[in-house]
Amino acid sequence: MNKLHIKKGDTVYVNAGDYKGKIGCVLKVFLGKQRALVEGVNIISKTIKPSAKNPQGGFEKKEASIHISNLNVLDPKTGKPVRIGRKLGERGMLIRFSKKSGDEIK
């Protein structure tokens, strides 16, 4: 399995689909499915059955996952969507960087 270019906490741009053009923060990444939960993107209504805690029941709005191929990380310098590269840092660990500006992405 390849490593993903998206991490939890990244600010991402949706580049395809119904939510194209939206910007949000990654809440969770599902490695096996190659999907991510992005704040404010792909909102669905989920039906809640009546229970002791919630006798009325009703609907709950929440984010559904979106495939990572539809996401680009935003460049910290320019604020525009960019492709991500990886290189070895000084301590021998991989660091992510913007292919356009060359800046490190934390």
Curated annotation (Swiss-Prot):
Transmembrane regions: none
Q: Which UniProt keywords apply?
A: Ribonucleoprotein, Ribosomal protein, RNA-binding, rRNA-binding
Query: Which InterPro entries does the record match to this protein?
Result: KOW, Rib_uL2_dom2, Ribosomal_uL24, Ribosomal_uL24_KOW, Translation_prot_SH3-like_sf
Which Gene Ontology cellular-component terms appear in the entry? Answer: ribonucleoprotein complex; ribosome
Give one Pfam family: KOW
- Output the superkingdom of the source species: Bacteria
CDD domains to which the protein is assigned, alphabetical: KOW_RPL26
Quote the SUPFAM superfamilies the UniProt record gives: Translation proteins SH3-like domain
Gene3D superfamilies per record: 2.30.30.30
Instruction: Name its GO BP terms in alphabetical order.
Output: translation
According to its UniProt entry, the function of this protein is described as: One of two assembly initiator proteins, it binds directly to the 5'-end of the 23S rRNA, where it nucleates assembly of the 50S subunit. One of the proteins that surrounds the polypeptide exit tunnel on the outside of the subunit.
Assembly description: Part of the 50S ribosomal subunit.
Which protein family is named in the record? Belongs to the universal ribosomal protein uL24 family.
Can you say what this protein is called?
Large ribosomal subunit protein uL24
